[in-house]
Design a protein with these regions (language model features):
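Flexible gly/pro-rich beta->alpha loop and the following alpha-helix that scaffold active-site loops
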Residues: 18-77, 90-91, 95
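Gly/Ala-rich beta-loop-alpha elbow adjacent to hydrolase catalytic centers
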Residues: 78, 82, 87
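Glycine-centered loop/turn positions within well-structured domains
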Residues: 84, 92, 126
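Short, charged N-terminal beta->alpha structural module
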Residues: 1-21
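Glycine-rich nucleotide phosphate-binding loop and flanking beta-alpha elements
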Residues: 39-41, 83, 128, 185
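Short amphipathic alpha-helical face segments that pack within enzyme cores
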Residues: 12, 85, 102-106
Length: 206
């Protein structure tokens, strides 16, 4: 049974994870989950604020303090805003405005290695930008093709793909699985949930 510590009050974000139970003690957790909400404040990644960015610096700093408590043998999982937060905590930046992703529906993503295709929910207007990191510090596992008509934000260059699920493995920090979509919003029978659970099982320290 995997123990999950959800950062903040939105405990339902973890409901799609198989064979898990919630814990209110972070030190007991196998998985520490960061949830959705406001944009991450650009000051955390050294960027100027885009006109569309709305953030809560108090929340960011509180969650940064939680992230710094996570042990190397615990897996961080980020959902939507949480995925972007984990990108920033690992030294990445954010695209502060994109189009055709805040659709409140699903769109196709594909595996970088095998090209396998899945549907994922999409409710966001910002996006992870890990491409400023060293290649060994991250791996884009799943992506979408260039759905957006633009990629706006301070210091953003061309995106080879649109990152949807990214694994961060920066030395001295916990492994982080950053999922842009909302698995908790998907139908329980959705095959994408099985794929995501396989990723969880792969990276949780036994």
């Amino acid at each position: 049974m995997k123990k999950v510590f959800v950062v903040g009050p939105a405990k339902s974000y973890s409901k799609w994870i198989k064979n898990h139970e919630l814990t209110d003690k972070i030190e007991e957790a196998d998985i520490v989950m960061f949830t959705g909400g406001e944009d991450v404040d650009p000051s955390l990644y050294g960027a100027h604020r885009h006109p569309t960015t709305y953030s809560n610096i108090q929340r960011d700093l509180e969650e940064k303090a939680v992230f710094e408590k996570v042990k190397p043998n615990q897996l961080c999982v980020g959902i939507c805003r949480g995925s972007q937060f984990l990108c920033v905590m690992n030294g990445g930046k954010l695209v502060q405005n994109v189009s055709n992703h805040a659709m409140f529906g699903t769109h196709e993503i594909f595996g970088i290695t095998r090209g396998d295709k899945w549907e994922i929910t999409s409710t966001h207007h910002q996006m992870q930008y890990p491409f400023n990191l060293n290649g060994g510090d991250y791996e884009v596992l799943y992506a979408s093709s260039h759905r957006s008509d633009f990629y706006e934000g301070d210091g953003i260059e061309y995106l080879p793909v649109e990152p949807e699920i990214v694994l961060y493995k920066v030395s001295g920090k916990p492994v982080c699985l950053a999922i842009q979509g909302h698995p908790e919003m998907m139908r329980p029978e959705a095959t994408t949930l099985e794929m995501l659970n396989q990723l969880i099982d792969k990276y949780v320290t036994k």
